[in-house]
Curated annotation (Swiss-Prot):
Key regulator of adhesion dynamics, it acts as an anti-adhesive. Plays a critical role in the regulation of cell-cell adhesion, multi-cellular development and, in particular, the formation of the organising center known as the tip. Required for turnover of paxillin-adhesion sites during cell migration. Plays a major role in normal cell shape, cell-substrate adhesion and actin cytoskeleton organization. SMART domains: B41, IRS. Residues 448-463 have a biased composition (Low complexity). InterPro entries: Band_41_domain, FERM/acyl-CoA-bd_prot_sf, FERM_2, FERM_central, FERM_CS, FERM_domain, FERM_f0, IRS_PTB. It comes from Dictyostelium discoideum. Residues 218-547, 666-1103 form the FERM domain. Induction: By starvation. Residues 122-149, 432-468, 715-734, 771-794, 961-980 are annotated as: Disordered. Disruption phenotype: Loss of FrmA leads to increased cell-cell adhesion and results in impaired multi-cellular development, slug migration and fruiting bodies. Mutants show increased adhesion because of an increased number, persistence and mislocalization of paxillin rich cell-substrate adhesions, which is associated with decreased motility. FrmA null cells are unable to efficiently sort to the apex of mounds and form the organising center known as the tip. They also show a delayed expression of LagC. Keywords: Repeat. The gene is frmA. Residues 437-447 have a biased composition (Gly residues). This is FERM domain-containing protein A. One of its GO terms (cellular component) is actin cytoskeleton.
Length: 1154
C-alpha cells in the first residue's frame, strides 16, 4: 500500500505540473508507467470491465456426430477454454446416454427373471436366492462397464489436443481455424453463424520426384525411381512453415528450416509451382488439402558453407546431390541448354555407370527425369547428351556427384529462390522528382494530372524496356537478381544493402532500391516478401554489428536513452501504414497534402481501416535517413502506445478529482419505439451519451450505450419553414432540401430525375448554403409528394450529437426526443435471449418492425411473408380457419404488415398475398407471443440490411464539368473531367483496368492523385438515385427505386472520408483498395459524416477498448516486458489512426484556404 500511495502522489503531482503534455510524460520511466496504469485500473476501473461477464450463445456443429448444439460462452474466454468446455459436455452427454442404456438393459434382465419366478413356483427359495445374486452380479458388472465405457468414450474421441474450432469462409475472408490463445471477442462471430468442432488432423499429399525418393530410401541408389505421392497426417491448424518443418523431421531431412511447400499450378506446365505463404494456414489461403497435391521444395539457402570434396560423408554427399538435381530439373536454378546437357550426362554416369553401346536403359530413359521442362522438346538434345556421356567413362559415382554439385554451384543462379513475375513498371528514383503518378490497383499503370489557374501538378512514369513481360525474380542471402527467362540474361542485380523498402498490395510487389523502383505482378507476392524478410532477418542475426548500429540509430533519433533496458529488440522488417512513411520531405504525398487545404473541406480518418499495402523497411540499407527512422520506429513503439493510454487515463483521473459544477436540470419528453412516452428530469450540461445511458439504466437496459436520442421533426413546421425560405431567397442561388428530398439531376437540368426517400429513417433538416458561384439546386417537394414523407418523420428524426451537452443542441422545451437503438455490432448483448433483457428486446422488436414496414430493412417476397405471418401470430394468436379467411384483411391493412408498394413491386394481387400469409400463419400454431417476437427479431437479423441506416446519394458524373480541371488516363487513352464550381472535389478519368488519374482542385489549387481512379466504383451507376447504407460491418449501395443491392464494402476498407458543405459532396476514400475514391452528391453529407464518426467511435470503444483496458491484460504478476507486449500490440498495429479516448476516436481537420 505504501508503494501505491507514493505512486498516486507522484502521478497527481506530475499531472498538475506538466499540464498533461505528451512530451513531458515521455520522461517518465517505463517501470513507473507500468505501476501507474496498474494503480489506475485498480482504483478507477472503467465501465467496460463489467462487460467481461457478457456471454454469447454460439452454435457448434459436432462434425463427428453430425449434429448442432448451442452453448453460451463468455466473450473473454480463450478459444482453448471453449474447446475444453465443448469436449467435456460431449463426454458427459455420452456417459449419460451409456448409463441410461445400461439401466434399461438391467431393468429388462430383472423383468425376465421375475417372469421365470412366476413360472417356477415350486422352487421359490432357490429362485429368490439366485435372483438376488444375479442382481448383485449385474450391478457389479454395471459399475465396471460404466468405468470402462467412460474411458472407451475418451478413447473413441481421442485426445482433446486433436480438436479445434473451424470457421467457414465469410463475405470478406477465407475459412480459418480459431487460434487457441485468442478470445471470443477477438473474432466477429454472428449469432446465425455456426462453428465446426472437429479434428485438426487431415491428410496431406506430397509428390516426390526421383531424387527425394532416394533420400528417403537410401538402399535404392543405383536406379532412378518414378515420381510417387506420399500421404501424411498433419495438423491443419498449423501454418505452412510449421507443416514443412514437421514433414522434414518425419522424412529425416537435414536443414528443415530451408524447406517449404508449393502448389502445382494447373495453368502452367513447367513444373515450377507456386510458393505458399509461410505464415498462413492452408484454409486461410483457400486451399483444401484433400483435393490438392503439394511439393516439398528447398526455399532457402542458409547453409552454403558446406565443403564439397572426397572427405564428405556418403549420406551427406547424396543429400546435397539430390538437392542440386531437384533444383536443376524443376528449373529452380535456371541454366542454359549447354549446361543442362552436362548435368544430364553426369546424371547418366551416376545412374547407369560407364557408357555401354546399345544399352536398352539409355534408349528408354525419360527426358523429363534428366532435363528441365523447357529443353525436353529440343531437337538432337539426346544425341548431345550421349556424346558427353561417352566422355565420362571411368568416372566413379562419387566423383560424378562431386562434379555435379560443383557445376551446380558454379551457376550464377545457385543459391537463389526464383519467382515468376511480370514487370509492370520501372522508374528511376531521383531526388529532384516532385510527385510521380501512382499506379492503379488493376493491371495497368496510370498517370494522373490536374491543373487550375494558380497551381498545376503532373505525374510522370519513366518506363524502361523491361516491363510488361515475364521475368524471373531471384532472392539469395546476399543479393536480388532479375533474369530474362528466355535467355537467362541478367536484367538487374542488387545487394540486399541497396534495398530501401518494399511493399505488397494484393498481387503487386514493389521494391525500391537506392536508384530505381520496380513493380511486379505475381501470384507469389506474399511469398516473395516472406523470403526477402527471412534472408534479411538471417543476416541481421549473423551480423550483430549491424543490429547494434540499427539500435543506435533508433536511440539517437528517438532520444529515449533511458528506455534501453525496458525495450526489446526491434523486428527486422516492421509493418506500418504507407501514409506515415516518408523518406524525404520533398517526396511527400502531394495528393493528401493539397486535399487538406481545400476551403470548407472537412476530412476524417477511419480508425477501423486495415492497410492492404504492407510496407517493410530494410534495416540493412545503407541509405537510411534520420527522418525515415524517426517516422518508422517511433510510430509503433511500445512506449508510445503506453503514453497514449496514460494520457487517456490521466484525463479520467482529472475528472474524478475535479469538482463537479452545479447541475442544470430540465425535463425532456422521450418517445420509445413501442409508442410509449415518458418524461425524465436530466442535467442539460451532460452530454447526450451520458443522458442516454441514464435513461437506459432507469429502464433496466443492460446495454444502454447502443441507444441514442433523435429529435422528432414535425412535418408541418418543416413545410412552413421551407416555404418561408423560398420566399426570402438570397442574391445567389442556394441549395436546400426538406424531408422528402426530391433530387434534381446534377448537371442535367433537362432530365427530370426524381426519387423519394420516404424510407429513410433519419431525415435531415433543410440545409441552406449560399455561395458566390452557381450551385446545384435541390428543389423543395411539391404538395403531391408531401404524403410520402409522413411515415419517415414519424419513424425517425435527427440524431443528436452524442458528445455535446444537451444545452448546446438548440432543443426547444416542447420538442420530443426519440429513444432508439443506434449501434449494431456483432450481436453481443442480451438481444440473443428474450428472457435475459426483456426491455431491450421489446424495444428492439418494435424498432425492427417499424424498419420492415417502412422498407428500411429491405427483404425478399418470401422473407416479407414470413415476417407478416409472424406479426399475425403476435397480434391474432393461432390460426383460426373460421376467422382468418379471405376477407378478414382489407387492402389498406397491408401497410401494418408489409413494406409499402409491395404489390406493385412483386406483381401480385392482394388475394394471393393474403392467401400466402394465411398459409404461413398456419405453420406457427402453438407459438406464444414472446417467442413469436423472438422469431421476428431473428428473421430481421438474417437480413443483410439489419441495423443499417440509409441516406439518399448520387455518384457524380465524371463526364461533364463546370470547373477548370483536367485528368488523363494512361490505360485506354480516355480523358474525363468533372468539376463543381472550382471548389468541390473533382474526380479523374475512369481508366481501363484499375488505372486512370483523378484530380482534386479547389480555389485555384490543383493536385495529382495518380492512378486511384474509379476502379471499384464502376459497379455503381452514375448520376442515378442511390441509397447509401451503413450496417454492422459493411457499406452498402442500393438503387433507390427497386432497392437492389449493387455492391458492399467492409468498414475496414474505408480509410477516410470528407464532406463539403457548400457543394454538398461526400468523398469515401478506400485507400489502396480497388475501389479508390467514390465521390457522392448528397444533401446529408454532414449527417452522414457525423453518423459514421459516432459508429466507428462506438466500435472502437466497445471492441478495441475493452481489450486494451482489460484486467487480464494489466496483470500485476507479469513482467515488464510481457506487460508492454501484451497490452498494446494486439489491435493498434492494424489501424491507421489509433486513439484510446472514449469520446473522439476519429480525427477531424478543418482547414482554410491557403
Amino acid at each position: 500500500m505504501a508503494v501505491l500511495s507514493l505512486v498516486e502522489l507522484c502521478f497527481i503531482s506530475i499531472m498538475e505540473r506538466m499540464e498533461y503534455n505528451n512530451q513531458a510524460l515521455q520522461k517518465i520511466p517505463p517501470q513507473l508507467i507500468e505501476r501507474l496504469i496498474n494503480f489506475m485500473v485498480y482504483k478507477l476501473p472503467p465501465n467496460h470491465l463489467s462487460l467481461q461477464t457478457i456471454s454469447k450463445p454460439i452454435r457448434i456443429k459436432l462434425v463427428r456426430q453430425n449434429r448442432v448444439i448451442t452453448m453460451r460462452f463468455s466473450i473473454y474466454n480463450t478459444i482453448d477454454k471453449i474447446i475444453h468446455q465443448i469436449y467435456e459436455r460431449i463426454i458427459n452427454e455420452e456417459k449419460m446416454e451409456q448409463n441410461e442404456k445400461q439401466k434399461n438393459s438391467s431393468n429388462n434382465n430383472l423383468l425376465s427373471l421375475l417372469t421365470l419366478n412366476n413360472n417356477n413356483q415350486n422352487n421359490n427359495s432357490s429362485i429368490i436366492t439366485t435372483t438376488t445374486t444375479t442382481t448383485n452380479n449385474n450391478n457389479n458388472s454395471n459399475c465396471g462397464s460404466s468405468s470402462s465405457s467412460s474411458s472407451s468414450k475418451q478413447i473413441l474421441w481421442g485426445s482433446i489436443e486433436n480438436y479445434g474450432l473451424f470457421q467457414q469462409s465469410g463475405s470478406f475472408r477465407n475459412a480459418r481455424w480459431l487460434q487457441l490463445d485468442k478470445t471470443l471477442a477477438y473474432y466477429e462471430i454472428d449469432s446465425n453463424e455456426t462453428l465446426e468442432f472437429k479434428t485438426c488432423k487431415s491428410v496431406l499429399k506430397i509428390r516426390f520426384f526421383g531424387p527425394w525418393e532416394r533420400v528417403v530410401h537410401p538402399l535404392h541408389q543405383s536406379t532412378m525411381l518414378d515420381e510417387t505421392i506420399k500421404t501424411f497426417v498433419f495438423d491443419e491448424s498449423k501454418t505452412v512453415s510449421e507443416i514443412s518443418m514437421e514433414l522434414a523431421k518425419k522424412l529425416q531431412l537435414k536443414y528443415p528450416e530451408e524447406l517449404s511447400l508449393k502448389v502445382q499450378c494447373e495453368e502452367e506446365d513447367d513444373g515450377r509451382g507456386i510458393w505458399l505463404s509461410a505464415d498462413l494456414t492452408l484454409p486461410e489461403q483457400g486451399i483444401d488439402p484433400l483435393y490438392t497435391i503439394f511439393l516439398l521444395k528447398r526455399q532457402f539457402f542458409f547453409c552454403k558453407d558446406i565443403i564439397i570434396d572426397f572427405s564428405m560423408d556418403a549420406e551427406m554427399l547424396h543429400f546435397v546431390f539430390c538437392q542440386c538435381l531437384d533444383a536443376i530439373i524443376d528449373t529452380s536454378h535456371p541454366c542454359s541448354p549447354t549446361e543442362s546437357i552436362l548435368f544430364a550426362a553426369l546424371q547418366c554416369q551416376i545412374c547407369f555407370g560407364d557408357y555401354v553401346h546399345g544399352s536398352k536403359e539409355i534408349d528408354q530413359i525419360r527426358q523429363r527425369d534428366f532435363l528441365p521442362m523447357e529443353f525436353i522438346n529440343q531437337k538432337n538434345i539426346l544425341k548431345e547428351i550421349l556424346i558427353q556421356y561417352q566422355r565420362l567413362i571411368g568416372m566413379s559415382e562419387q566423383k560424378a556427384k562431386l562434379n555435379y554439385i560443383q557445376l551446380a554451384k558454379s551457376l550464377k543462379t545457385y543459391g537463389y529462390t526464383f519467382f515468376k513475375v511480370t514487370n509492370r513498371q520501372t522508374s528511376i528514383v531521383n531526388n529532384n522528382l516532385s510527385s510521380s503518378g501512382g499506379s492503379g490497383n488493376g493491371s495497368g499503370s496510370g498517370n494522373g494530372s490536374s491543373s487550375s489557374s494558380s497551381n498545376s501538378s503532373s505525374g510522370n512514369n519513366n518506363n524502361h524496356n523491361h516491363h510488361n513481360h515475364q521475368q524471373l525474380f531471384g532472392i539469395s542471402s546476399e543479393a536480388v537478381l532479375t533474369l530474362d527467362p528466355m535467355t537467362n540474361n541478367t536484367i538487374s542485380l542488387y545487394s540486399l544493402s541497396n534495398i530501401r523498402k518494399w511493399h505488397v498490395l494484393n498481387n503487386v510487389f514493389t521494391i525500391e532500391y537506392n536508384d530505381r523502383k520496380d513493380t511486379f505482378i505475381s501470384m507469389e507476392a506474399e511469398a516473395i516478401s516472406h523470403v526477402l524478410s527471412s534472408y534479411i532477418h538471417h543476416n541481421l542475426r549473423e551480423t550483430p554489428s549491424i543490429q547494434k548500429q540499427w539500435d543506435q540509430n533508433y536511440l539517437s533519433v528517438s532520444g529515449r536513452n533511458s528506455l534501453t533496458n525496458g525495450r526489446k529488440r526491434l523486428s527486422t522488417c516492421s509493418n506500418c501504414s504507407s501514409d506515415s512513411m516518408e523518406f524525404d520531405s520533398s517526396k511527400s504525398n502531394t495528393k493528401d497534402k493539397d486535399w487538406k487545404y481545400q476551403y470548407g473541406l472537412v476530412i476524417k480518418k477511419c480508425a477501423l481501416y486495415i492497410e492492404p499495402k504492407k510496407l517493410y523497411i530494410n534495416p540493412l540499407s545503407t541509405q537510411i535517413t534520420g527522418s525515415m527512422v524517426n517516422k518508422e520506429l517511433n510510430k509503433d513503439t511500445k512506449v508510445t502506445k503506453v503514453l497514449k493510454v496514460l494520457t487517456d487515463l490521466s484525463s479520467k483521473m482529472i475528472l474524478s478529482f475535479s469538482k463537479s459544477s452545479p447541475a442544470k436540470e430540465r425535463e425532456i419528453v422521450v418517445k420509445f419505439s413501442d409508442k410509449k412516452v415518458k418524461s425524465f428530469v436530466v442535467d442539460e450540461q451532460k452530454t447526450v451519451s451520458e443522458i442516454t445511458q441514464e435513461i437506459g439504466l432507469k429502464l433496466g437496459i443492460k446495454n444502454p450505450e447502443e441507444f441514442s436520442l433523435q429529435l422528432i421533426v414535425n412535418n408541418k413546421n418543416n413545410n412552413n419553414n421551407n416555404n418561408s425560405n423560398n420566399s426570402s431567397t438570397s442574391s445567389s442561388s442556394s441549395s436546400s432540401v426538406n424531408n422528402s428530398g426530391i433530387f434534381d439531376g446534377l448537371n442535367n437540368s433537362n432530365v427530370n430525375n426524381v426519387f423519394y426517400n420516404s424510407y429513410i429513417v433519419n431525415s435531415s433538416i433543410s440545409n441552406n448554403s449560399n455561395s458566390n458561384s452557381n450551385s446545384n439546386i435541390l428543389n423543395n417537394s411539391n404538395d403531391e409528394q408531401s404524403t410520402s414523407t409522413s411515415t419517415s418523420s414519424s419513424l425517425g428524426g435527427i440524431w443528436l450529437k452524442p458528445y455535446q451537452p444537451l444545452s448546446e443542441q438548440s432543443i426547444s422545451p416542447d420538442s420530443k426526443l426519440l429513444f432508439k437503438k443506434k449501434f449494431y455490432t456483432s450481436d453481443i448483448g442480451a438481444a440473443d435471449d428474450c428472457n435475459s433483457d426483456p426491455v431491450y428486446f421489446n424495444l428492439l422488436f418494435f424498432q425492427s418492425k417499424d424498419a420492415i414496414i417502412s422498407n428500411t430493412y429491405t427483404c425478399s417476397k418470401e422473407e416479407a411473408i414470413q415476417l407478416a405471418a409472424t406479426l399475425f401470430q403476435i397480434n391474432f394468436g393461432d390460426h383460426n380457419p373460421n376467422i382468418h379467411k379471405p376477407g378478414f384483411l382489407k387492402s389498406q391493412d397491408l401497410k401494418f404488415f408489409l413494406p409499402p408498394n409491395s404489390l406493385e413491386l412483386w406483381g401480385l394481387s392482394f388475394q394471393k398475398i393474403e392467401k400466402s400469409i394465411y398459409k404461413e400463419h398456419q405453420n406457427l400454431r402453438g407459438i406464444k407471443e414472446v417467442y413469436a417476437k423472438y422469431r421476428y427479431v431473428q428473421l430481421c437479423r438474417s437480413l443483410k440490411t439489419f441495423g443499417a441506416i440509409f441516406f439518399s446519394v448520387r455518384q457524380l458524373l465524371p463526364n461533364k464539368t463546370n470547373g477548370s480541371s483536367s485528368s488523363s488516363s494512361n490505360n485506354n487513352g480516355g480523358n474525363s473531367n468533372n468539376g463543381i464550381n472550382g471548389n468541390g472535389i473533382i474526380t479523374g478519368g475512369n481508366g481501363g483496368s484499375g488505372g486512370g488519374g483523378s484530380g482534386i482542385g479547389g480555389n485555384g489549387s490543383g493536385i495529382n492523385t495518380g492512378g486511384n481512379g474509379f476502379g471499384g466504383s464502376q459497379q455503381i451507376p452514375i448520376n442515378q438515385p442511390l441509397v447509401l447504407g451503413f450496417s454492422r460491418k459493411c457499406i452498402l449501395f442500393m438503387t433507390a427505386k427497386t432497392k437492389k443491392f449493387l455492391v458492399e464494402y467492409p468498414l475496414t476498407h474505408l480509410r477516410r472520408w470528407a464532406y463539403h458543405k457548400d457543394t454538398q459532396c461526400l468523398t469515401l476514400d478506400f485507400g489502396d483498395y480497388e475501389m479508390g475514391r467514390i465521390v457522392l452528391q448528397t444533401t446529408e453529407s454532414e449527417e452522414i459524416s457525423s453518423y459514421l464518426s459516432d459508429y466507428i467511435d462506438y466500435i472502437q470503444t466497445k471492441l478495441v477498448g475493452s481489450q486494451s483496458f482489460s484486467r487480464s491484460i494489466f496483470n500485476s504478476d507479469n513482467n515488464s516486458s510481457s506487460f508492454f507486449s501484451n497490452s498494446f500490440c494486439n489491435n493498434t498495429t492494424t489501424t491507421t489512426t489509433t486513439t484510446t479516448t472514449t469520446t473522439t476516436t476519429t480525427t477531424t481537420t478543418t482547414t482554410n484556404n491557403v
